[in-house]
Amino acid sequence: MTVDINNIVGGSMIKSIKSVDFRYSGRVEKNYTVENEILNYWNELRKKTNFLHESNILTVSNMTCINDNYSIELKDTTFSHFMYSKKNQLGLICMFSGAYIVTSDNYIVCVLNNYYSNEETFQILNLIGGISDHCDIINGQYSSENCLKREFKEELGIDLDQTCFQTNLKFIKCPSEDEKTFTCEIGMIYEIKSLFTKDELTKLFKSSKHDDEVTDLIFFSKKNYRNVYEFSHVKPLIPELLEKIYSEKCIQINKVIVKNR
């Protein structure tokens, strides 16, 4: 797959976004040999983990940007293909929706979740959210918000359609200079404003029914956000995101235009 990364890659991973135009263009083509290699790798991988599940995911086959206006072409493939590509550094780029929560008492919420990489399973500091799925294609159009709502329900047991949550698209995560030749992720990053306090949100998470991917909520404030650098495992975008939020004081509503075709 080829992604047009002119004016996109390099410098900051967390970039401003004015509009995004999604285009769904079918399925990634793979030959018989690659299909067999993927299947064999996946069968071995499933013996090592119990939280990875096969699904049809969406990948970025092309992306362009002009003045913070993005055009993204999507194709679907299997999650096993993505993991195989990740292991072999084949450059497959998946699409994701992710979010942080802003509580009513002004904490920013990320999560600890189970993660598998480089033949190891561990917990990592991450956004809430996950890889976009074929089920997020609705009437032939990709819905990033549908992906986000689905992931919130699965990971936290929280329904984002409740009136106590307000969803705003804030940023786009693009490949860094180091990532551009490897399997990586491109995604929409949302800010979720909540009427719940830190303690209320913690109680809601503990009492809700959800999967076992997310193990804990992690709260940051203006005073302690640099504690992010003390975590053993953290998604590279998280420190940059927190620095951007707190340095620019950008906890506010942005209106981003989302198009589908």
Please place each PLM-identified region on the residue numbering.
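N-terminal leader/linker segments that precede catalytic domains of diphosphate-processing enzymes
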Residues: 1-125, 131-150, 157-261
